[in-house]
């Protein structure tokens, strides 16, 4: 199988294309174009009758897609989040959908985007800089409880309360406007440890997820993708942290597997699967990690939408689809004796 251009190394490139099973005349949607590494691979397998729809909420990624593929009649470009893919495609018309979640390498590498604690820049973190509130704006007005809830819920940061109190105290003295300011402040209040991970890692992740509504978009996008796929169509999702992967795993399982029965409840209607799991968690091997260390946390999951004839053959007893909600920062979390999250 061909390899992507050296200038951009998309994670799990070969595994994604194998999972999507791209056909010459199929219709595919890349909901997170980024810099187009996976999209190029899909196009290599499409013939003149194939179609590729690309989406991205980042205006810079949209500009790259227009420059790279604007002259290709097989490609249509749609600015915006994949959560709104129902505005781009009709139901049951797509052969494959790819969602490559999280922040992209270009977003991390450009200090001016404000995503990285390793590069000083404006404290922004918005994937679409023209929409919504920046990280600096939110931190300037959120209460310490709201900040702590976000850090714990989206970053699983054990020192969430301590960090939140420090942010509120510091902003009373001077505004937090730069990524280095925030990273240094977090590092200054964290207990000393042996971890090789930067002390601001979890907090930056949590704030970014909150600012961009990433988990809300993910759940909406998964629901929309299921409706957009044809029977036999494939959904491939790459996640980069446990919160994302948990949502993806639970979503696929909810439509593929009958829930456990409960003898205390009345007999339910037979469970009819909508998805078939193509693979479990797929991770990068050592050869990929050697050239692309950022792939170390990537997890790919693939599922196939079933047609009615296949759904009936997979019927089992169950109690219907249980609600699967992503965590919200409004939820209360327990505290340890020192007042921080456990």
Curated annotation (Swiss-Prot):
Recorded hits in Pfam families, A to Z, give: Methyltransf_5 (PF01795)
Reaction equation(s) it catalyzes = cytidine(1402) in 16S rRNA + S-adenosyl-L-methionine = N(4)-methylcytidine(1402) in 16S rRNA + S-adenosyl-L-homocysteine + H(+)
**Localisation per UniProt entry:** Cytoplasm
For this UniProt entry, what's an example GO CC term? Answer: cytoplasm
Q: Which UniProt keywords apply?
A: Cytoplasm, Methyltransferase, rRNA processing, S-adenosyl-L-methionine, Transferase
Instruction: Give a GO biological-process term.
Output: rRNA base methylation
Provide ranges: composition bias, Polar residues.
Answer: 333-342
Q: Where is this region: Disordered?
A: 309-342
The record's EC number reads 2.1.1.199
Q: Where does S-adenosyl-L-methionine bind?
A: 36-38, 56, 82, 100, 107
User: One GO molecular-function annotation for this sequence?
Assistant: rRNA (cytosine-N4-)-methyltransferase activity
Q: Which domain of life is it from?
A: Bacteria
Determine if Ribonucleoprotein is one of this entry's keywords: no
Its annotated function is as follows: Specifically methylates the N4 position of cytidine in position 1402 (C1402) of 16S rRNA.
The family note in this entry says: Belongs to the methyltransferase superfamily. RsmH family.
HAMAP family, A to Z: 16SrRNA_methyltr_H (MF_01007)
What is the protein's given name?
Ribosomal RNA small subunit methyltransferase H
User: Which species is listed as the source?
Assistant: Xanthomonas campestris pv. campestris (strain 8004)
- Taxonomic path: Bacteria, Pseudomonadati, Pseudomonadota, Gammaproteobacteria, Lysobacterales
């Amino acid at each position: 199988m061909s390899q992507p251009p050296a200038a951009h190394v998309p994670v799990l490139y070969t595994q994604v294309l194998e999972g999507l099973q791209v056909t010459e005349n199929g219709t595919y949607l890349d909901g997170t174009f980024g810099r187009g590494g996976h999209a190029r691979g899909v196009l290599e397998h499409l013939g003149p009758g194939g179609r590729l729809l690309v989406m991205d909420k980042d205006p810079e990624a949209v500009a790259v897609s227009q420059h790279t593929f604007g002259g290709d009649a097989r490609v249509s470009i749609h600015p915006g989040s994949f959560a709104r893919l129902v505005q781009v495609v009709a139901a049951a018309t797509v052969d494959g959908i790819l969602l490559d979640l999280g922040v992209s390498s270009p977003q991390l590498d450009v200090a001016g985007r404000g995503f990285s604690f390793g590069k000083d820049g404006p404290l922004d973190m918005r994937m679409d800089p023209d929409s919504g509130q920046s990280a600096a704006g939110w931190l300037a007005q959120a209460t310490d409880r709201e900040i702590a809830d976000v850090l714990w819920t989206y970053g699983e940061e054990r020192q969430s309360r301590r960090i939140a109190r420090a942010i509120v105290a510091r902003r009373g003295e001077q505004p937090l406007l730069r990524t280095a300011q925030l990273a240094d402040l977090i590092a200054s209040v964290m207990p000393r440890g042996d971890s090789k991970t930067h002390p601001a890692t979890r907090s930056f992740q949590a704030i970014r997820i909150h600012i961009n509504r990433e988990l809300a978009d993910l759940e909406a996008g998964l629901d929309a993708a299921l409706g957009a796929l044809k029977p036999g169509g494939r959904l491939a999702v790459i996640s980069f942290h446990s919160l994302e992967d948990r949502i993806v795993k639970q979503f696929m399982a909810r439509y593929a597997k009958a829930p456990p029965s409960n003898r205390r409840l009345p007999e339910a209607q037979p469970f009819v699967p909508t998805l078939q799991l193509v693979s479990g968690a797929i991770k990068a091997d050592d050869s990929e990690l050697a050239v692309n260390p950022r792939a170390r946390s990537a997890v790919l999951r693939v599922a196939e939408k079933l047609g009615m004839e296949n759904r009936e053959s997979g019927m089992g007893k169950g109690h219907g689809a249980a609600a699967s909600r992503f965590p919200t920062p409004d939820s209360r979390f327990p505290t340890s004796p020192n007042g921080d999250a456990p």
